[in-house]
């Protein structure tokens, strides 16, 4: 009997969900087992959350379970994404609920993978005890006898590198936790859970009216087993920064679904700017979201420059208000810390080997300066290629080797194009920058569901990007097993992990995915399409709203809409003493 394609897709989809479930179960097992080579000790009173056993996992078992979770999660994502391309589907709401329940369960058990959460607790403790987190180190606070600071392992001699909003959240958690590092970490975990869940619900709302896109968003973010491990179970602040980035896109380009949206008015631009500024006050990398929003406006409003200027001014004013307040609070000490961090080159980055070669010719900090310049140039090149190559970004152009129009362009129009520009800048930075850690990819994963996929026929550009991002995140996850150094000595039988994976395999895979991204975007060959009543609707440049068919535009013809189609889918080398991950 010949098997119908839908049957094969259903089998792959079911297998993918089983693999994802197994990955989450293994992640939970490592966390609930208690302190191990993967999980630092959380000092605190007995019975305080987060709760765990004291199973004393051997280093071999802890690493094996974590590696198994990464492998199962990666396989599960591959299967479900491919199954969706074959027409497989399940209720998106069920996946959202399952993902949120998994995230909640992982919040109730201790974080693992790195010891960054202990540094967060110490920075909050500094704030509530009257110390400046940007000039005070956990070691200095520990010398005063503070029990929370004494619990810090990695980054023991490093002041905070996070924005004032992140520090304020850490301070509030410290007020609740008091002298208990354990309870403080738990409160921070609740904040991270809220940010993760808010992104999940935002994406689901933004994709309303399209079950396929809602399912894709749920699988790529809410039920993504790699993010559940690296961001939620890892308790990293990157989820908070990602929330403000997604919220800015949602506000700027709304309403999503329902009636056809117009180009945003200045209040939306100002509100989006404020959200970007708040994200900047968590992690400075969120400034890329604001830059992407500005570029998106410039691309689509070139024929109406009189409208463009006030919108850009509103966006900039909103950002300046929030980011300016953050800089005023953080002061020059925060800027110095950010400057020092920008000089770091992760061992897992291919730039580490490049810098070593440059060191043979130059001395001092010149090699690092050359690497930073090269990374900046690469990021610009990647951003340009991505903006030119993603579907629906440039008005009147398609992008897909299969020759079709990108789906969701007609269904989402300007919002999809704007989100694609923001995604392009974030992805370019991630693939180009010398300082890389697995959880940094969270912002790209959060924005990816907003980018329309290419048609089912042929290999879509966005689908190819999805595979490259998955390969990159998985490689970093394996490379940082564990992302700890202090109090996490590996036994002789596991001593090969860092020199083989982190120093060797991970940089090679990251370099390979970057090269493949360049090739993919160069081969996308953007081509201009002519507008016809059947496949496009002209935009009136005076109002920047869709024209009714047959109506003569009052100004130059702007962006055109295409027919809808299927919407499927460190350790730092420069880290101060005891630094392993950030």
What residue ranges belong to the model's regions?
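Transmembrane-helix signature of polytopic, membrane-embedded enzymes
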Residues: 90-94, 203-224, 399-405
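Intramembrane catalytic core of multi-pass membrane enzymes that act on lipidic substrates
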Residues: 88-189
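Membrane-interface alpha helices of multi-pass inner-membrane proteins
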Residues: 228-231, 265-294, 424-431
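Transmembrane helical bundles and short interhelical boundary loops of multi-pass, membrane-embedded
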Residues: 2-3, 11-66, 299-301, 311-315, ...
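Multi-pass, polyprenyl lipid-linked donor-dependent membrane glycosyltransferases
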Residues: 190-194, 210, 218-251, 266, ...
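Specific aromatic-rich, kink-prone transmembrane helix
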Residues: 198-202, 241-260, 385, 426
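Transmembrane signal-anchor helices characteristic of membrane glycosylation enzymes that use polyprenol
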Residues: 19-38, 68-115, 131, 317-329, ...
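Transmembrane-helix motifs of polytopic, lipid-linked glycan transferases
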Residues: 23, 72-82, 183-210, 242-243, ...
